[in-house]
Amino acid sequence: MKVKKLVVVSMLSSIAFVLMLLNFPFPGLPDYLKIDFSDVPAIIAILIYGPLAGIAVEAIKNVLQYIIQGSMAGVPVGQVANFIAGTLFILPTAFLFKKLNSAKGLAVSLLLGTAAMTILMSILNYVLILPAYTWFLHSPALSDSALKTAVVAGILPFNMIKGIVITVVFSLIFIKLKPWIEQQRSAHIH
């Protein structure tokens, strides 16, 4: 069973990496903020195997992305930010879906994940991530007002939109995937 779990998590990580490459900017937001659907395989991993599997998918896709594409900052600041955002987004599903085992429960848990990702990534970008980018890029530090503007006009709406879009997309495909996910989960438990 451990081999099967390893294979499934590896396959989901590979799919997540490919989905990460198929990103697109959202109109009206800064071009460096791109939406992708790479959190979908991590949600599937969580529903089948639990939180550690979902976190593993988030980690592996970002490591692969850094190895293959690198980072404009030279260090994986963006990948770390993506890992944190993805983990914040998917973790409520790991804990709430077990209690609310339904499509409605899934939507509620993903919307809570959207709220967690939006709020905490806004704070982390203000305090840590955006200052790290400027430091590693050897750019002048952003003023307090520039940081606030970047977060309020870019980061906050981006994470909210991304979470809502992924929630809607996953909720729609969940209807078709639910029997397969339940079959995989019951095979994992037994």
Swiss-Prot record:
<feature type="transmembrane region" description="Helical">
    <location>
        <begin position="77"/>
        <end position="97"/>
    </location>
</feature>
<dbReference type="InterPro" id="IPR025720">
    <property type="entry name" value="RibU"/>
</dbReference>
<dbReference type="GO" id="GO:0032217">
    <property type="term" value="F:riboflavin transmembrane transporter activity"/>
</dbReference>
<feature type="transmembrane region" description="Helical">
    <location>
        <begin position="155"/>
        <end position="175"/>
    </location>
</feature>
<dbReference type="GO" id="GO:0005886">
    <property type="term" value="C:plasma membrane"/>
</dbReference>
<comment type="function">
    <text>Mediates uptake of riboflavin and roseoflavin, a toxic riboflavin analog; may also transport FMN. Probably a riboflavin-binding protein that interacts with the energy-coupling factor (ECF) ABC-transporter complex. Unlike classic ABC transporters this ECF transporter provides the energy necessary to transport a number of different substrates. The substrates themselves are bound by transmembrane, not extracytoplasmic soluble proteins.</text>
</comment>
<feature type="topological domain" description="Cytoplasmic">
    <location>
        <begin position="176"/>
        <end position="190"/>
    </location>
</feature>
<keyword id="KW-1003">Cell membrane</keyword>
<feature type="transmembrane region" description="Helical">
    <location>
        <begin position="110"/>
        <end position="130"/>
    </location>
</feature>
<dbReference type="Pfam" id="PF12822">
    <property type="entry name" value="ECF_trnsprt"/>
</dbReference>
<feature type="topological domain" description="Extracellular">
    <location>
        <begin position="131"/>
        <end position="154"/>
    </location>
</feature>
<feature type="topological domain" description="Extracellular">
    <location>
        <begin position="61"/>
        <end position="76"/>
    </location>
</feature>
<comment type="subunit">
    <text>Forms a stable energy-coupling factor (ECF) transporter complex composed of a membrane-embedded substrate-binding protein (S component), 2 ATP-binding proteins (A component) and 2 transmembrane proteins (T component). May be able to interact with more than 1 S component at a time.</text>
</comment>
<feature type="transmembrane region" description="Helical">
    <location>
        <begin position="6"/>
        <end position="26"/>
    </location>
</feature>
<keyword id="KW-1133">Transmembrane helix</keyword>
<feature type="topological domain" description="Cytoplasmic">
    <location>
        <begin position="27"/>
        <end position="39"/>
    </location>
</feature>
<feature type="transmembrane region" description="Helical">
    <location>
        <begin position="40"/>
        <end position="60"/>
    </location>
</feature>
<comment type="similarity">
    <text>Belongs to the prokaryotic riboflavin transporter (P-RFT) (TC 2.A.87) family.</text>
</comment>
<dbReference type="GO" id="GO:0032218">
    <property type="term" value="P:riboflavin transport"/>
</dbReference>
<protein>
    <recommendedName>
        <fullName>Riboflavin transporter FmnP</fullName>
    </recommendedName>
</protein>
<keyword id="KW-0472">Membrane</keyword>
<keyword id="KW-0812">Transmembrane</keyword>
<feature type="topological domain" description="Cytoplasmic">
    <location>
        <begin position="98"/>
        <end position="109"/>
    </location>
</feature>
<keyword id="KW-0813">Transport</keyword>
<dbReference type="InterPro" id="IPR024529">
    <property type="entry name" value="ECF_trnsprt_substrate-spec"/>
</dbReference>
<feature type="topological domain" description="Extracellular">
    <location>
        <begin position="1"/>
        <end position="5"/>
    </location>
</feature>
